[in-house]
Design a protein with these regions (language model features):
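Active-site hotspot residues in diverse enzymes, especially metal/ion-binding acidic/histidine motifs
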Residues: 1-247
Length: 247
């Protein structure tokens, strides 16, 4: 399966809550506003200091624990709600993917964990997630709090891969990418529409890539990676000889 069970559940919940239909490219900003307790804010020349200023202008004090820099996207979540910031001057396809990526983080790395904890410990555990009190001993030993961000949750989508991470962080980012791609271009819809009968892998990959960009509005880089991953997941990836040529 291209998505793990939890990720697939998040995608299905989003589709049902947001009334996502069969029209593509998906209006992801509208879908987010319908499906999630989150808003999308577009800022030109998006920097962390600009995010801080936006939050301060609404009466809250918040600072990132790092220097200000330009980012493609940013998620700030607190109190069960999220704000997705996106670079307003990026091309439309890049903005679409950024919003979907940050929405994926909001669902899988923040909201889901919070909701599961509330279901297990009761609504008062939300005070712990929001950093308004320390967890009790019983709450502290609960596995749901392991690795959870208490207080304000933030996530940044950098403008390049210079700071590419490994290990657990890579897996989290990869999961967010997969959820984002499934929201914008559901694998079952893509595979039902594309012709993968070409004998050469390069031709099959180009066919999927073109559909992802033209029909679903994905930016070139994630579209290319998605095309290859989808083909491999359905047994239409590169042959052994072709894989040697791709290295």
């Amino acid at each position: 399966m291209w998505l793990d069970g939890a990720s697939q559940a998040a995608v299905e919940r989003f589709r049902q809550s947001g009334g996502v239909g069969d029209d593509y490219p998906l209006d992801i900003e509208r879908a987010v506003s319908l499906a999630l307790p989150a808003v999308v804010v577009k800022q030109p020349r998006l920097e962390l200091r600009g995010v801080e200023a936006w939050i301060a202008g609404r009466g809250a004090a918040f600072r990132f624990n790092c220097r200000s820099r330009s980012v493609r996207g940013c998620l700030v979540a607190y109190g069960g709600r999220g704000t997705i910031f996106v670079e307003a001057e990026d091309p439309e396809d890049e903005r679409r993917f950024t919003v979907a990526h940050e929405a994926a983080h909001f669902m899988s790395d923040y909201l889901s964990l919070r909701e599961r904890a509330c279901a297990k410990f009761g609504p008062r555990i939300a005070e712990v997630f929001d950093g308004r009190r320390k967890p009790t001993l019983n709450e502290r030993v609960g596995a749901l709090l392991a690795g959870a961000t208490l207080g304000v949750y933030t996530e940044l989508l950098e403008r390049d891969d210079a700071g590419a991470a490994g290990g657990a962080v890579y897996r989290i980012e990869d999961r967010a990418d997969r959820i984002a791609l499934a929201l914008l271009a559901p694998p079952e819809v893509v595979l039902a529409e594309v012709d993968t009968s070409a004998s050469a892998f390069a031709a099959r990959r180009e066919s999927v890539n073109r559909l992802l960009c033209e029909r679903f509005g994905l930016p070139p880089q994630p579209a290319d990676a998605y095309a290859r991953s989808l083909l491999e997941s359905t047994g239409r990836g590169a042959s052994w000889v072709e894989s040697l040529r791709l290295r």
